Swiss-Prot record:
Component of the eukaryotic translation initiation factor 3 (eIF-3) complex, which is involved in protein synthesis of a specialized repertoire of mRNAs and, together with other initiation factors, stimulates binding of mRNA and methionyl-tRNAi to the 40S ribosome. The eIF-3 complex specifically targets and initiates translation of a subset of mRNAs involved in cell proliferation. Pfam families: CSN8_PSD8_EIF3K. It comes from the Eukaryota. This is Eukaryotic translation initiation factor 3 subunit K. Component of the eukaryotic translation initiation factor 3 (eIF-3) complex. The eIF-3 complex interacts with pix. The lineage of its organism: Eukaryota, Metazoa, Ecdysozoa, Arthropoda, Hexapoda. Keywords: Cytoplasm, Initiation factor, Protein biosynthesis.
Amino acid sequence: MSHLVKMENGQSQTIQEMLGCIERYNPDHLKTLEAYIQDQAKNNTYDLEANLAVLKLYQFNPHMLNFEITYTILLKSLTNLPHTDFVMAKCLLLPQQMKDENIQTIIDLADILERADFTLFWQRAEVNRTMFRHISGFHDSIRKFVSHVVSITFQTIKKDLLKELLGGIEDSTLESWIKRNGWKHQGQDLIVVAMQDDKIKTKNITEKIEFENVGALMAQCL
């Protein structure tokens, strides 16, 4: 869905055009931006700049604060881990937002993900599943981040552990993630995440040092 912002002169701009000018700080555009965020959640799209602009507008206009939109912005930022989007969004929160119980829950979930305690994350996510059920692709976005961490941490991993880290998924779902990440089976119980040769590669480094660079040092040694 295309969102157009109507200017005072009667002309319309796209959200991206509006964000590139002073109009991004106009509270008259807040409702359009909030609708855009709801579409991101529904259609599994993401626009960090627009989302941060909404939080900034809340800072300037706290009487227009919408907690539901704030939840969606924070949860969508989690779907873009390992990028630091959540940290940037959190830094724009108002004191009344920080005191909100649901926002504290989301912050706790973010901390758990940052610690890579994925088993605990999925447990907490199940308890709070109504919080992000409106966000299309949320679980798979988190699994993508889990896969990233697994890929840089393990060479081989037990199949049952991998299923647990990915949220207690079924074998058929696991197969799709193995294929997506280029992993391979080793026997019945192990998954090869990365071959040793792929992890360790020699690199020859040649540095050219001019005589003038060391001349003064050599003179001191004489």
